[in-house]
Amino acid sequence: MGIIVREMRGWWKSLRLAVLLVVGLLLPLGPGGQTAAPAPPALLLGTAWYPEQWPASRWDADLALMQQAGVRMVRVGEFAWSRMEPSEGQYDLDWLDRAVAAAAKRGIYTVVGTPSAAPPAWLTQKYPETLLIDEKGLRAEHGNRQQFNFDNPKYRELARKMAEQMAKRFGHNSWVLGWQIDNEYSDVSFDAGTKADFQQWLKARYGTLDNLNARWTTAYWSETYFDWNQIPIQTGYGNPGLLLSWMRFVSDTWRSYQKNQLEVIRANCDSRQFITTNMMGWFAGYDHYTVAKDLDLASWDDYIGQGHLDAAENGATHDLTRGFKGKNFWVMETQPGAVNWQKINNSLDKGEVRAMAWHDVGHGADAVSYWQWRSALNGQEEYHGTLLGADGTPAPLYDEVKQVGAEFAKAGPVLAGTSPKSEVAILHSYDSRWAIDWQKHNANYDPKEEIISYYRPLRAIAQSIDIVPATAALGGYKLVVAPGLNVLSDEAAKNLIEYVRNGGHLVMGQRTAMKNEDNGLQTERQPGPLADLLGGRVEQYYALLETVPVQGKFGAGKGRLWAELLSAKAADVEVLERYGKSNGWLDGQPAAITRAVGKGRITYIGAWLDDAGMKAAAAWMTEISGVRPAFGPVPYGVEVSARYGGRGTVYILENFANGADGGAACGDDGCAGRRDEAVGDFGGIRRGGAFGSPLRAGWGANPGIYKDRRGF
């Protein structure tokens, strides 16, 4: 019997080997002979990897350390043009092909970056016209990045050829998930060619000089133009219509610059490969909605810089990015510890990088990628945080990222197909932010901070916020808030009026609808085309040297930086707040008014309220709008994020209280008295236990990932 068993075991071993060989032969092979990739994880941990900076003999050691840390994606190539095309027309992508294949052997996917952010020396030497000209008329030189002219035809031609070569090589590689075009669009050129193209853009937009002169009111200061080539480029201070037109031209030019490469990539790659570019949060150098139109995926670079994670500030940036495409996004770069470009480059606290990662995911990130993997031995960013030191051994942060990788692998299947959604939207407009920045009227007025001042209390109550443009579809929101929507186009005005008439609640903040779409003053008092619906208007605005007292429905508090004297013109308008004794003009006058319009409502808040006032205002507007929290009451400092879809609802809870007393903790009955199924025992949270039992102090010490049982 023993012999038979041995024979049977030998037979089974031979059969298993034969089956494996047959399966191996039948599996499709990708370029370079590697096995075709399986479907990528729903939640990816990644890093920026620069194989061109290191000998090929070191690659696998790096990739092995990535694999051990749970890194499943690398971004490569975005600064390697000189290696890929060492001289004009002589392309060398073999080394990059080998790097992609080496990553694949470790089960690591790749995002390929086109290298146009850093042109090679031969290019800028041979074609100096491809270098940008700054506002002072100085031409950039080689030795940095982003020194190219984004409007130059020759540069676009060479960048397109490079992108085409890359797409032909990697467009059908199943281990390549997608493409990043360029890197962090930012610097523009003020050369003669760009100026001429701007003038042609104006001609296409306005048609005639008479129309342009009328809409810009160029009779002011004798600015009238008699020829298109008389129109200058102005930034910062100048005719408001000209300034806004220049920024719109810049946005369109970045879009066409991007499309120049995007077209050849799309023509040569599989439809499953996405195309993105890495944006920079609240950076206002161009209109991100315009640039995002042609992309498959929005992504951004999440850097805290100096200081520490502010959950509301960072969360708003995630929600802004999610709004560029109206769906989940990627964090293409984030800091592993510290940066190198602030006045004080403090490192993030232990646990803070992990807290950031889960915070990203809660707000809709499907990938979190660290910049960068290993310190370069030289270069401008030697001091920037990395996962490996220059010696090639793990930095102290490596183990924390490894923990994130393990958690992502565990939670990914549950988060698959889920995304945030909200009953509350905040409207955001680049036109409006630019317009206010050019004419602040109070040097301390920051339009981004105005948005955050509304976002912070609203997010705490609703536990989910969308940030969208004023032209977005608004029908699914119970509450829409428009802080500082200074420039209001006819299209946006029509959209907002329709939203209110269909039963929504629109809340406007100060400075709303002062300007038309040419950045000129509206012919009606604020809020311009929305005044009739409001049944009231702004009689006068005041930049504030001191705070002013405000009292009413939102309690007693202060108005800061800006206050507007409101008046009610319709009998059914309710005054919510009034000013106290201040400058005489505002004394006793309405500071906030509201009006029911059929099943809808429209509200105007004319003062930038202090924190307590904003919190009370947020509570009032959410209650009267019927907004429900995504999850339910939680202790102070606990942030809830909800992702819907897939097989149900997934909640992510993090404790940001970070106080000496341990901050918040949920009781035995759980937060909001709820018990649901824990997805993972992350940081001591018990599987199947109450939410966050306990939520310890520290940077997201115990991020709780939970499934709503009702949805499964």
Locate the predicted segments by residue.
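Bacterial N-terminal signal peptides that target proteins for export
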Residues: 4-19
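Bacterial N-terminal signal peptides
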Residues: 16-28
